[in-house]
């Protein structure tokens, strides 16, 4: 075994020399013990830790906390296998949740709202529907219950300064992949990407993580958020109704080779936004979005 670390080599030399002076016949056994000890030390330093989540195999993750943020939406916190584990999910990618419901294996994709470098856990924001499958299953979870998850997966992976500007249009929990990207951009002083976000909801109470979004827009001039409500309260200063062409023209970057528009939300909304953006001169949205696409739907 070659000892490349000078301190390790020196310590080993002292041990071997001492053994020789006390009992020369024991030298081979002491040398073997020294070699085995340092082999274990070096192995611990170089061993690669197994990722807590696998892209192909579903694994179980225990629910440790549940916080409601609107009447039908909650944040679900799941523990990773070890306290020092990191999910290390690429920015813009998601995980798959699978459950057996009425004898059928059903899966849905979700993007964690927690950061990929949060230690020991990940958080999912889920809106539950009475007729939903996976979303209803989440609403029935109790602390200590487990889910089956695998990942990462997805065609989008954000890298700093990948384009000059990003326009985002999301509805409800479609916020989650956008939030990942927004956080990554504003916390990196070298990332100069401009971000404009149109966030649509039914009522003001439905706006998920509004306090964080408002704070980010106040602290970081490169990020702007525009809220749209179907049912707006009196005195509301944001958009009212459905996201339309005029809102997109005012709040999104104009079509150009160095911009992207990201869409995420209920299927009818994404379909409507795909048509409006194409009518405004953006590229046509492909059935399955790929990273190079100008308009990408999650």
From Swiss-Prot:
Cofactor names: FAD
Q: What molecular function terms (GO) are annotated for this protein?
A: cytochrome-b5 reductase activity, acting on NAD(P)H; NADH dehydrogenase activity; transferase activity
Q: State its Enzyme Commission number(s).
A: 1.6.2.2
- What is the membrane topology here? Single-pass membrane protein
Chief subcellular location: mitochondrion
GO BP annotations, alphabetical order:
protein histidyl modification to diphthamide; tRNA wobble base 5-methoxycarbonylmethyl-2-thiouridinylation
Please tell me whether the keyword Transmembrane is annotated for this protein. yes
Q: Name one GO cellular component term.
A: mitochondrial outer membrane
Report TM segments. Answer: 14-34
Q: Per its UniProt record, what PANTHER family does this chain match?
A: NADH-CYTOCHROME B5 REDUCTASE, NADH-CYTOCHROME B5 REDUCTASE-LIKE
General function of this protein: NADH-dependent reductase for DPH3 and cytochrome b5. Required for the first step of diphthamide biosynthesis, a post-translational modification of histidine which occurs in elongation factor 2. DPH1 and DPH2 transfer a 3-amino-3-carboxypropyl (ACP) group from S-adenosyl-L-methionine (SAM) to a histidine residue, the reaction is assisted by a reduction system comprising DPH3 and a NADH-dependent reductase, predominantly CBR1. By reducing DPH3, also involved in the formation of the tRNA wobble base modification mcm5s 2U (5-methoxycarbonylmethyl-2-thiouridine), mediated by the elongator complex.
**Annotated protein name in UniProt:** NADH-cytochrome b5 reductase 1
